[in-house]
């Protein structure tokens, strides 16, 4: 969904079907190859990672905000990553893309709080049941090894959804990132 044209068509369809833009935007794009050494990350891989993880959230926010401002209410929630805060098992290209998302969240939250719009992010790490971690054995010996997670298990998509719902329901919480990592740093 990195194409601005595709995203614009999506918004046109929403406008046509519902007669208005979205009140709540949840941007949950995620891509990242586990390439630990910067020397092994090609410029194309770096660009692709930012184009998937950061660019669509910018475009979606840009298209959502006018409607939210008009109605004086809105929620924008980005699904970021522990990597945005310097942790995780992916490379610096992934961390940079998610840190960019965190910066976008902070900037939009400050600018649009007065408009009745909250902007936050949930920063999960080591979430199972998504297909991204096919087997806990893959993680053995890495920073994401389940034995390194203080709660002793992977997180679940439902736990991520619970944080997203909290952000949707809470108008006094903006500019915040909830690290959902089982205590992993």
Q: Each predicted region: which residue ranges?
A:
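Active-site helix of classical SDR
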Residues: 61, 97, 105
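Alpha-helical segment proximal to the catalytic Tyr-Lys
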Residues: 66, 110-114
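Residue(s) in the substrate-gating loop at a strand-loop-helix junction
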Residues: 81
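A glycine/serine/threonine-rich, flexible loop-to-helix segment
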Residues: 114, 124-148
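Short, small/polar-rich loop/turn modules that mediate ligand/substrate recognition or access, typified
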Residues: 113, 118, 173-176
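C-terminal substrate-recognition "lid" of short-chain dehydrogenase/reductases
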Residues: 73, 153-180
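Substrate-binding pocket helix/loop in short-chain dehydrogenase/reductase
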Residues: 36-38, 45-47, 133, 145
